[in-house]
Amino acid sequence: MPVSDGRGLDRFIAFPYDHYRDDPLWVPQLRRDMRTLLTPGKNPFFEHAEAQYWTARRADGRTVGRIGAIKNDMHNKEHNDRVGFYGFFESIDDQAVANALFDTAAAWLRTKGFDTMRGPMSPSVNDECGLLIANNGTPPSLMMPYNFPYYQALHERYGFAKAKDLLAFDGGGAQMAPERFVRLAQRAGERRGIKLRTLDMKRFDAEVELIKALYNSAWEKNWGLCR
């Protein structure tokens, strides 16, 4: 069923809370944050993008899956392709349910002129993206995807093929950076005239533009980047 009102969006947001309720590793996102992420007018992403969301429901009304289809105009302008995206995918371990969700998203993307569907992107490469296919028994990290192991099979049986390996590195949060690395960083900064300073709130807009420029420069060779 397409999400067409606030009640439908509430159901879309609520499904993972039921889906993962017995998984001790799952860390829920705040519902308020999810609503902001999904809503045009609240998320600046939708200044250059469009999305449609659906939930899958049994005859008894029980929700068994969800998906979103995303049209990212900035991506297609920058990369000159016809790639549409899907994201926010969740499903019970039932291939028929997953297929129906994938088919629905693909059909919507075809109406927008796309010939390729890529994901999960929730909703973009700057947010949660990719599918967890290894180390499912470890706690999830911030902005990293988390899903049941059977999701890989649902995708492969549908016919998806890998577009890119996405890697997450565990730095051991309780560990301090090795002293040698700290010394090297300090020397490099001194040689290049780099200084660390606090944010100047009196020049907030200029500081935001500077951070944006630094971010884009650091990530310009990252796969799928949209500036």
Sequence positions of predicted segments:
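Acyltransferase donor/substrate-recognition loop-hinge adjacent to the catalytic core
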Residues: 145-224
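A short helix-loop-beta-strand connector motif used in the catalytic cores of GNAT acetyltransferases and
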Residues: 39-55
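Short low-complexity, flexible loop/linker segments enriched in glycine and/or proline
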Residues: 37, 132-135, 178-180
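Short amphipathic alpha-helix that is part of the acyltransferase structural core
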Residues: 1-41, 82-85, 190-227
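Conserved beta-hairpin
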Residues: 50-67, 156-158, 162-165
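A short acidic/small-residue loop/turn micro-motif
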Residues: 71-73
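Acyl-donor binding region in acyl/amide transferases
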Residues: 76-164, 222-225
